[in-house]
């Protein structure tokens, strides 16, 4: 059974909060660049992606990183690949 988008979004936010607990997830705009809204360095970003890998069982190749700029893009990406 596919995972619904609200569950994916919740999982993405939980992965983000594990790295940056100070983030106000209620204030995030799904369409804005995530890095403009959250102070993440490159190592933090890799840890968020690792959290997504662990949570959803998906591999995220480095060539796809540019496709994951907004919260909506991340949710869409995970929805396409999650099992």
Place the predicted regions along the sequence by residue.
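Thiotemplate assembly-line natural product biosynthesis machinery
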Residues: 2-25, 81-82
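C-terminal structural segments of small proteins and small subunits
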Residues: 66, 72-81
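Phosphopantetheine carrier-protein modules
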Residues: 19-39, 55-67
